[in-house]
């Protein structure tokens, strides 16, 4: 049945939070989605689109309709001397796409290995890791407007990408459902090894040649060492964004805290590592009942088993208040909080 009622969501979010959706649909095609949206009895419902459930926190049950996008398929649209264009369904697992590209020799997303979630969520969040952002390989996407049923194509400019952000998280939030994404990948790789511990790990791995496979292997190793596997410990990866502040404020913080890591950006701003701010505020390894902060990565809030969404959210708010008090910096959640 295309529309189900009172469906448990615990297995559909990587936090492993027990919550229930009033209505739920697993959507495997564009035609199926259009048919469902034509049901007038569903028009007034709150709607939530999910993919892998890896960037979401249910603080309570969802009294609306959860639309679970599962449109699959990877199609090569074309190529020239330098690039390959791929058309990818929103329901394709992101890491599976990365592995597919590595196997084919398509470069550009190897630094984004092992990021959980689906392709349809990647442009919403403008996912990024280890010096690379999704927007760098993005060409366009097709999305269905919920209110009209019309399909619109968005180019890079229309998506208004910024750090872990896009128009689909701001002015168009909840108005469109992404169906397919087109990526422009490179035939000749430009290796990004200057971020994090990639160079150090590559040196220990000693690959015969530097390749996109070697970069991916290094990133996978780093992520597996630092981040808990949600199959065993519930989490949504990085809970907070790295805050961006103006350089004047960064200078004040540097004067007060000489060891604070500051990454100067080209636009007159600076980025601070949220993990450092959280750790310096004393939260690393914190645990209260079933909820806590990961021992190795302070950016990750974890559910050790049986935690409620309210308990996770309460901890997140306490961390925000603590960092704001200590550093006069407000951390912004990267996770989509449903309350």
Curated annotation (Swiss-Prot):
Recorded catalytic activity of this chain's protein: UDP-N-acetyl-alpha-D-muramate + NADP(+) = UDP-N-acetyl-3-O-(1-carboxyvinyl)-alpha-D-glucosamine + NADPH + H(+)
Q: What EC number(s) are associated with this protein in UniProt?
A: 1.3.1.98
Q: Where is the FAD-binding PCMH-type domain?
A: 16-188
Q: Pathway it belongs to?
A: Cell wall biogenesis; peptidoglycan biosynthesis
Q: Which SUPFAM superfamilies match?
A: FAD-binding/transporter-associated domain-like, Uridine diphospho-N-Acetylenolpyruvylglucosamine reductase, MurB, C-terminal domain
> Which principal EC class is assigned to this enzyme?
oxidoreductase
> Gene Ontology cellular component?
cytosol
GO molecular function (one): FAD binding
PANTHER family to which the protein is assigned, alphabetical: UDP-N-ACETYLENOLPYRUVOYLGLUCOSAMINE REDUCTASE
Which family is it part of? Answer: Belongs to the MurB family.
Query: What name does UniProt use for this protein?
Result: UDP-N-acetylenolpyruvoylglucosamine reductase
Gene source species: Amoebophilus asiaticus (strain 5a2)
As recorded in Swiss-Prot or TrEMBL, the protein's gene is named murB
